[in-house]
Amino acid sequence: MTSTDNDNILYEYPLQERMRTYLRLEHGFEQLKASRVCFDEQAEPFFNALFAVTELLERCDIRTELTKDLELDKQRLQKWEEHPDVDRDALQRTISEIEHCINTLQDIPKYLRQLKDDALLTSIRQRFSQPGMSGLFELPQLHLWLSQSAEEKQQQCERWSQTLALVELAITLKLTLLREQSVFAPIQLQNGFLQESSEQLLAMLRIKVPRSAKIYPVISGHRQRFTVRFMPLPGESKETSLHDIEFELARCSP
């Protein structure tokens, strides 16, 4: 996820393959929501997002990996139950949310089967998976479907989206827990390059860069070692300073 506020741009980089998958799914669900807003003007982004999310869920064993991660989160939170200063109600709500998500993840094959058995989606999916633009002359069944009223189309899109809503909920919860347990620390670099090793296993890096700096991070690494190099936007002036760079870094552990 890359987001902005008034002063900073937030970049995130996964250091584990399953975190990469989680972030891709989060992005796919965000695209699915955004495309529904302008569905009447352009339907292609919605179907592209729906098929991309579906394909990712079919290729990756999300059920096993995400269940395992949420179980670990649950165990970690349960250790706080006897702490005198903890908000027990809030803690129990979060634990209950985790348990609910773990239970619903077991039904992922059923959700995917529902989409795979949808006659319209099955008839157009292969065309959407091919490179290049598709014209409605190649998809007359979609052309007919698009001629329905806006209300009918929105209702159908809602049903398709709701099929995967519980998966989205679990992904959102996992990434929220991961992000909230990390703390940003200020860092200043003299040469625009950071290399760091960690005894603790890391899952993701989060980097806040001032908008005014007009630079972006190029990140590489794995769970115990990573590098960050800052670069100006391609095509921008080479005079962009890469010295005395100030940013904030959060190291997220699984």
Curated annotation (Swiss-Prot):
Domain of life: Bacteria
Subcellular location(s) per record: Cytoplasm
Keyword Cell division included in the entry's annotation: yes
Primary localization: cytoplasm
GO biological process: division septum assembly; FtsZ-dependent cytokinesis
UniProt keyword Cell cycle, yes or no: yes
GO cellular component: cell division site; cytoplasm
Keywords, comma-separated and alphabetical: Cell cycle, Cell division, Cytoplasm, Septation
Membrane-crossing segments per the record: none
Pfam families linked: ZapD
Family classification: Belongs to the ZapD family.
Subunit: Interacts with FtsZ.
Function: Cell division factor that enhances FtsZ-ring assembly. Directly interacts with FtsZ and promotes bundling of FtsZ protofilaments, with a reduction in FtsZ GTPase activity.
UniProt cross-references to HAMAP family, sorted A to Z: ZapD
Stored PANTHER family: CELL DIVISION PROTEIN ZAPD
Protein name according to UniProt: Cell division protein ZapD
Source organism: Idiomarina loihiensis (strain ATCC BAA-735 / DSM 15497 / L2-TR)
